[in-house]
């Protein structure tokens, strides 16, 4: 996601720490309840996270091939066309809109696991000169302009994006108080059309039909639809009510509570349960 490249360093830090501490990591391994019981663990920490909420069965046409979750888009599993509708204007919806309109976004399928261990690798980020042009910050040191600001360069977005939410009111009102204005400014300057109070009627090969906040039926002619309508906890590994497993189970992170999940809360959950054990 543009602007979040620094989080890569956090991931790389944990990978190196796990290796340094001798933690055994098993990838591409399907885990089930029987495997956990057979292993005779004393504690099992379920940090299985979340999956994007699907609209299949809830919205006509949600199973069409041009419809995808934000995870499918960002992983590179699916790609979008030149016109895109984003369903959901929470934090993820804004992130996806920025990713779709910025020139320096990079899908995860371009990042092999070997790059995470390469100390010289850094995600492709916006250059300083590009940042100055976008935000109208002059590089002159004589401060001939007020506040060192000039008129920003006109931005030609790489695709047309519609960002929609069901509730009425300003989009992005629930974003972070210190940086939310940056995200709102980005989508505005990149020509993202913001739609509030939308009722999603159906998705067809023509695009997505909505009822706008004035009660009028409207067709948004888009090539692709990205669903950012929240996420759901993955808890299949937790014991059922009445089970008596040998291990003590702990549920943390998004698996514990999917709503409003962020990295800070997930890391804190992990630290607290580890300290308790």
Locate predicted features.
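Short catalytic/ligand-gating loop segments at beta-alpha or beta-beta junctions
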Residues: 197-205
